[in-house]
């Protein structure tokens, strides 16, 4: 390593997002190509819909085969899966999606083709909503809401922390679409359940964050505010003494990150970039249901 490179590396800020060029072989069609791939990122906070905020792209960018547009979301596929994916990717329908839809919306369609678990498809749709344009947003949220509602039905009797956070996402999407009264009713019903539903070694911290976010949602609803909003950080040092403050990018490790709900997306600061890209995309599809921070980046 040259001295200039070494000095530049040593001087790089801790909150870094890095990219590197990686060689790939497309699982569908065998095309060889290189792509700029995100290798690391740092999270400072999260939005109420789970999208990470910081020196990171959220959702984690998917690598795309330039020829046919296949998205690399797993390291390996079964023979039947490759046959089904190959036929779909070559179809006019999929090629049309390349010009009209986001990468995670297309990922959701690929997951549907191979009959992936419903939680994987739901996670892809959640991330698609983070990418959506103003025109796409209502349609994307409607699809994500329907997928998540099947994972955490309102009438579910076996409730836990994952059910709670999934319900919080449904309320967030209702608010974002200006459906304020259903959102208000949902959050008012959820708030008294937080302490009982959140379990685990970090339950006090997680429950405090969930309760703060629900209170924040109710304030936004009272104000008729449907905008995308940073979540409060109920566990920041100042918040511990003064209570919840307006949403800020203060503490990367926030509530639902510790709740172990299956929406976590991996993005460490050091890793082989090719493996990182494949793992991150696979985790985005595989582990999706509900983690308020969506776990992307350094902690």
List each language-model region with its residue ranges.
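"A position-specific structural signal for the A-helix of alpha-solenoid helical repeats
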Residues: 127, 169, 209-213, 217
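Amphipathic alpha-helical repeat scaffolds of TPR domains
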Residues: 85-87, 91, 98-135, 161-173
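N-terminal signal peptide c-region/cleavage motif recognized by signal peptidases
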Residues: 9-13
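N-terminal cysteine/histidine-rich coordination modules
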Residues: 15-89
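Compositionally biased, proline/threonine/alanine/serine-rich low-complexity intrinsically disordered stretches
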Residues: 230-299
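Flexible helix-coil transition and linker loops at the boundaries of alpha-helical arrays
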Residues: 106-119, 149-161, 196-203
């Amino acid at each position: 390593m040259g001295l200039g490179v070494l000095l530049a590396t040593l001087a790089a800020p801790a909150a870094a997002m890095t990219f590197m060029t990686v060689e790939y072989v497309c699982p569908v069609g065998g095309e060889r190509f290189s792509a700029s791939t995100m290798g690391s990122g740092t999270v400072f906070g999260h939005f109420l819909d789970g999208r990470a905020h910081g020196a990171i792209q959220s959702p984690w960018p998917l690598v795309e085969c330039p020829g046919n547009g296949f998205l690399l979301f797993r390291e390996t596929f079964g023979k039947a899966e490759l046959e089904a994916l190959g036929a779909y990717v070559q179809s006019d329908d999929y090629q049309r999606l390349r010009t009209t839809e986001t990468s995670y919306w297309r990922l959701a369609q690929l997951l549907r083709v191979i009959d992936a678990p419903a939680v994987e498809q739901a996670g892809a749709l959640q991330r698609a909503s983070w990418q959506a344009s103003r025109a796409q947003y209502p349609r994307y949220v409607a699809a994500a809401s329907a997928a998540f509602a099947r994972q955490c039905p309102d009438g579910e009797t076996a409730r836990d922390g994952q059910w709670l956070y999934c319900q919080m996402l449904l309320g967030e999407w209702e608010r974002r679409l200006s459906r304020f009264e259903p959102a208000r009713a949902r959050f008012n019903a959820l708030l008294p359940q937080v302490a009982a539903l959140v379990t685990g070694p970090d339950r006090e911290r997680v429950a405090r964050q969930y309760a703060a976010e629900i209170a924040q949602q109710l304030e936004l609803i009272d104000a008729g505010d449907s905008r995308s909003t940073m979540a409060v950080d109920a566990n920041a040092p100042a918040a511990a003494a003064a209570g919840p403050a307006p949403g800020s990018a203060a503490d990367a490790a926030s509530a639902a990150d510790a709740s172990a709900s299956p929406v976590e997306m991996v993005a460490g600061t050091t890793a082989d970039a090719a493996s990182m890209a494949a793992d991150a995309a696979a985790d985005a599809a595989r582990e999706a249901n509900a983690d308020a921070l969506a776990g992307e980046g350094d902690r």
